[in-house]
Amino acid sequence: MEAPPEHCPGVESEQAGKVSACAGCPNQGICSDPNRKVEDPGKALVAESLKDVKNKLLILSGKGGVGKSTVTSLLTRYLARSCPNSNFGVLDIDICGPSQPRLLGALGENVHQSGSGWSPVGIDDNVCLMSIGFLLGSVDDAIIWRGPKKNGMIRQFLSEVDWGNLDLLLLDTPPGTSDEHLSVVSYLKDDTQPESLRAVIVTTPQEVALLDVRKEINFCKKQNIPIVGVIENMSSFRCGNCGNSSEIFPAKTGGAAAMCAEMEVPLLGSLPLDPQIAKACDSGDDITEIKNSTTEALDGICSKIMSSFS
């Protein structure tokens, strides 16, 4: 098949070959054939590229602004520190809002091409990162792409990056259950090793966030993706002056704990709003040297995550 038009709905869409964007496309007849069997050749390429990646972990949230990208970077730092003999990769598939280069202290780094594909950027001895943020001319450049182009970029990241031997690949996803989620799940699901792809879901305590997180949990259940558990972020705020704790986002309906009990998924732990952590993330500093209740909670959460893959 020839290259699709820019606004192609995608060969897996029910609208394939039927919408105005398909007019004049040489593949329109193929796509609109109700008897066609759609097999994305990219899936085989992804499987070959990731054959040495033991496990994959999707970091998800139905709601934007809950700190999913921040939690991804914190988990990466702590997993790498607690498992120094293991190798970790981070793939930032939040195409329109890539945050990992800043959070992991890699702003301004360049991606290099080798005979094996793109080389991800090294963060630590046992951590590497790939993000579209490395491919932009400026950190302020806007990415205005429709679904098929985003999906094509995700396929390239999965099939054309030289990830090498990884014990765990963490994928920072955009909020919701959009094209990016469907695309990455279709490429990563392996029926022969269903337990190699799992999910962690991030929320905040208030009902407006939990409402969408429930949808994300149901998305995982429908896609048969095992859920390691839920992390409640910004659960409280401890004042650095008086030491008192406050609920910035009151859990009027019981917070993540009540939701997890209702939906029968584990609660991995809770993380407070922490000015020290926020400052370190903004500057891309390693937060593993900070010792407080937040980092203690992170240690416990990371232990549960690694245990789920053993």
Swiss-Prot record:
<keyword id="KW-0408">Iron</keyword>
<dbReference type="GO" id="GO:0051536">
    <property type="term" value="F:iron-sulfur cluster binding"/>
</dbReference>
<dbReference type="GO" id="GO:0140663">
    <property type="term" value="F:ATP-dependent FeS chaperone activity"/>
</dbReference>
<feature type="binding site">
    <location>
        <position position="31"/>
    </location>
    <ligand>
        <name>[4Fe-4S] cluster 1</name>
    </ligand>
</feature>
<dbReference type="GO" id="GO:0016226">
    <property type="term" value="P:iron-sulfur cluster assembly"/>
</dbReference>
<dbReference type="Pfam" id="PF10609">
    <property type="entry name" value="ParA"/>
</dbReference>
<keyword id="KW-0479">Metal-binding</keyword>
<dbReference type="GO" id="GO:0005524">
    <property type="term" value="F:ATP binding"/>
</dbReference>
<keyword id="KW-0004">4Fe-4S</keyword>
<comment type="subunit">
    <text>Heterotetramer of 2 Nubp1 and 2 Nubp2 chains.</text>
</comment>
<keyword id="KW-0067">ATP-binding</keyword>
<feature type="binding site">
    <location>
        <position position="239"/>
    </location>
    <ligand>
        <name>[4Fe-4S] cluster 2</name>
    </ligand>
</feature>
<dbReference type="InterPro" id="IPR028601">
    <property type="entry name" value="NUBP1/Nbp35"/>
</dbReference>
<feature type="binding site">
    <location>
        <begin position="62"/>
        <end position="69"/>
    </location>
    <ligand>
        <name>ATP</name>
    </ligand>
</feature>
<feature type="binding site">
    <location>
        <position position="25"/>
    </location>
    <ligand>
        <name>[4Fe-4S] cluster 1</name>
    </ligand>
</feature>
<feature type="binding site">
    <location>
        <position position="242"/>
    </location>
    <ligand>
        <name>[4Fe-4S] cluster 2</name>
    </ligand>
</feature>
<comment type="similarity">
    <text>Belongs to the Mrp/NBP35 ATP-binding proteins family. NUBP1/NBP35 subfamily.</text>
</comment>
<feature type="binding site">
    <location>
        <position position="22"/>
    </location>
    <ligand>
        <name>[4Fe-4S] cluster 1</name>
    </ligand>
</feature>
<keyword id="KW-0963">Cytoplasm</keyword>
<dbReference type="InterPro" id="IPR019591">
    <property type="entry name" value="Mrp/NBP35_ATP-bd"/>
</dbReference>
<dbReference type="GO" id="GO:0051539">
    <property type="term" value="F:4 iron, 4 sulfur cluster binding"/>
</dbReference>
<dbReference type="InterPro" id="IPR027417">
    <property type="entry name" value="P-loop_NTPase"/>
</dbReference>
<dbReference type="GO" id="GO:0046872">
    <property type="term" value="F:metal ion binding"/>
</dbReference>
<dbReference type="InterPro" id="IPR033756">
    <property type="entry name" value="YlxH/NBP35"/>
</dbReference>
<feature type="binding site">
    <location>
        <position position="8"/>
    </location>
    <ligand>
        <name>[4Fe-4S] cluster 1</name>
    </ligand>
</feature>
<dbReference type="GO" id="GO:0005829">
    <property type="term" value="C:cytosol"/>
</dbReference>
<comment type="function">
    <text>Component of the cytosolic iron-sulfur (Fe/S) protein assembly (CIA) machinery. Required for maturation of extramitochondrial Fe-S proteins. The Nubp1-Nubp2 heterotetramer forms a Fe-S scaffold complex, mediating the de novo assembly of an Fe-S cluster and its transfer to target apoproteins.</text>
</comment>
<keyword id="KW-0411">Iron-sulfur</keyword>
<protein>
    <recommendedName>
        <fullName>Cytosolic Fe-S cluster assembly factor Nubp1 homolog</fullName>
    </recommendedName>
</protein>
<keyword id="KW-0547">Nucleotide-binding</keyword>
